[in-house]
Structure formats: C-alpha cells, structure tokens
Design a protein with these regions (language model features):
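Structural motif
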Residues: 85-86, 100
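Short, hydrophobic/aromatic-rich segments at coil-to-beta transitions
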Residues: 67, 97-102, 123
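Short, conserved secondary-structure segments in the cores of folded domains
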Residues: 68, 78-79, 86, 92
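Short, positionally conserved secondary-structure boundary motifs
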Residues: 1-78, 109-110, 117, 121, ...
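PDZ-domain C-terminal substructure recognizer with occasional recognition of PDZ-binding tails
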Residues: 106, 111-135
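A structural signal for the main folded, soluble domain(s) of proteins
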Residues: 1, 9, 89, 132-133
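Hydrophobic beta-strand signal
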Residues: 89-90, 103
C-alpha cells in the first residue's frame, strides 16, 4: 500500500525545528552530553562521567526528509503511552504494517490509531478501551507511521 502524502504536511528537517502547525522553523542542531546510566530499579552508587554525546535528531529521526512532527490532542492512544500535548514523529516514507501506530485520514477525518489488517479488512484501533474500532466506510489514506513520541515533563 503506497502512503499518500498530505498536501498540508511538510517535512521538518530537524526534530526541534519549531512549530509544525505554524510552519515556523528553527534549524539549529545541538548535541547533548550523555553522562552515564541511571538505575530505574534498585538504587546504585551514582557515578558521573562523560560517556558520549548524541544528537536527538539522529536518535529519533531515521528518515529526515520524510519525517514531520504532530502535536497530540485527545486521549485515544494513552494506553500506548501517547498523551495529550505529546509530540509524535511521523515517517511518511515507511510502509505501514499491521500493528503500527499510523496517522490516517479515514472517511475525511484525521486520526492516530493502531493499524490492524486481516486479509482485505482494515481496522483502526485505539489504545484506550473507551473508543470503538474504526472501520473505513469509503476511504482510508495512511499519511505515515509514528516512529517516536516526545514528551516534556516541565
């Protein structure tokens, strides 16, 4: 299945490139220092040392030219750890397969859901049991596959 590219979406060349919705872009890159590891289970002695540096763009975006950001509204994907106000990174160059979280236009409405395929039947499934599965009546266009979620805690 070919992934149509929505006309209003533009590739954002850098992960933190400003507001996708407003079209503003800031094209600075930075590398963040990796200072070691932290135990998320039982406490361990703390040691800090410079281990490496990394670019969040390189870590989170595999296909820069085909990727863009969307800000999440609604709570249908909270069971997948995607919360309102999160940013999702979408790769419109990936072929969507069953089980992927996709951005889809279904019967004229945009949504983010799990893609489920069984033979010729396609269903979009929320990660929140309060929402019913969506079975396209007329048309389904997959705009891209969600590849990462970005959340700011403060």
């Amino acid at each position: 299945m070919a992934l149509p590219i929505p006309k209003k979406n533009k590739a954002v060349p850098f992960l933190f490139a400003g507001s996708f919705a407003s079209g503003k872009q800031r094209t600075t890159r930075s590398r963040t220092r990796v200072r070691g590891t932290v135990e998320a289970g039982f406490p361990s002695p703390a040691e800090e040392e410079l281990v490496d540096t990394l670019s969040l763009d390189e870590l989170l975006i595999q296909n820069r030219e085909a990727s863009f950001l969307l800000r999440v509204t609604g709570d249908s994907m909270t069971g997948a750890g995607i919360m309102p106000k999160d940013l999702v990174i979408v790769d419109r160059g990936r072929t969507a397969k069953s089980g992927d979280i996709v951005i889809a236009e279904v019967d004229g409405q945009w949504t983010m859901k799990y893609l489920r395929k069984r033979g010729e039947n396609v269903t979009l499934v929320a990660a929140n049991p309060r929402y019913q599965p969506i079975r396209p009546k007329h048309e389904l266009k997959i705009a891209g596959v969600v590849t990462a979620v970005v959340r700011k805690y403060t």
